[in-house]
Amino acid sequence: MSRRLVAVWLLFVALAIAIVLIERQQRAVTSAEEGSRDARRLLPAELADLGAIEVMHKGTLHRFERDSAGAWFYHGIHTGSEQQHAHNADPAVAAQIEKAFTGFGRTRMERQFPLNIQADEFQVTRPDIFIMVYRPKEMQPLARYAVGIVAPDGVSRYVLPVGSTYVVTIANYQIDNLLNLIRAVGGKSGQGNPKK
């Protein structure tokens, strides 16, 4: 073999090694970024891993659940004296709920403040809005959130993850979207009514 051919092969091998090393480094950076983003998520689980979300707004509980096929429906409240019943998810309403919850599932915690229960400067000790998220078929919530007032910046809202010693801020539009969802589907006839 000529020296030129050997030089070309050595150059080719060096380029291949460089490409492999660059790819590994980019994967490591991407993994680290994804891990740090996950640490800022408000919800402790992916939306696909949740079976129900309850939003209490001014004393009224609004429950959203997934049916056996995984479609969301507005459940409403049952008195406990009712017999076994099933629900049918309206595809249009299910899509509307899925869209709102997909957005809520992406909620990121922005800032963090120490909780001072006596001062209640964020109004999270007696909130008008309280959110609970559940895994499928579980009675105890996976996480609970007391939603406080809108921050002075007008675009953030204070939220207390129950059990935390810190109040966090999230984008206020996430709460607005949940309240708009309640207004849109909470009053629709047929949603939450048992099918016997």
Regions of interest found by a model, annotated:
Residues 1-196:
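A short-motif feature that recognizes glycine-rich, charge-decorated loops
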